């Protein structure tokens, strides 16, 4: 039986991967205005609106019916499906997928325990496993183990958006705001951790490199993806240059993409993100 990959729209993917999967969108709200993530608003338009608007956007999870629509398509095509969602600790989207899956056979829901590029690299690994001829169940079993090794580290321009979205405490946000320092965060096992605070992007970039080393380094045999939030990729390109010893001779090409609307709502513009499987 052929297997398709279904993901929610918070998984940040490069175009060639995006073409191979089926996406269930979440919803972004600017006040009374409602947008379907990746459908009625693209990343560029979202960040332009985020920067210009006085209204903090909010997000809504995908519903069981949203997933059921995709599951029905898989059923009609005679295909099994592996469903990869953002961390259940961040959103009820995973729960929605599980509720919908209860009405279908051969649907396997995986809580990525990650977000953005972290979910994205798990999707890439899923496609790789299927391309290698793994069965649906074999692929699911491997993915459930490998997701424990996903590390996402991010240098944010500010903690303000995370605070306003209720993702971190006001005390942590205040600490990040002192002297306009840039916070370095990690996402592991569905939780956000403040790793350190840097005065300026260069020190922040050094902290990102330090955290990669702290977790034991990168498994270069598995997918790696970098990302940025906002309209310009200049900060990310500066990070790549500053951290060149990590990548030199190990990657033919450093791949990166933009952080999508839903996660961008909480990260704000000006973030640099690195997602990888640790050794």
Q: Language-model segments: which ranges?
A:
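Class I S-adenosyl-L-methionine
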Residues: 35-103
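Mixed-charge interfacial surface used for oligomerization/domain docking
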Residues: 3-4, 10-18, 22-27, 32-33, ...
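Short beta->alpha junction loops
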Residues: 60-61, 111-113
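Short active-site oxyanion
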Residues: 1-4, 80
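Conserved residues at beta->alpha junctions
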Residues: 85-88, 113, 230
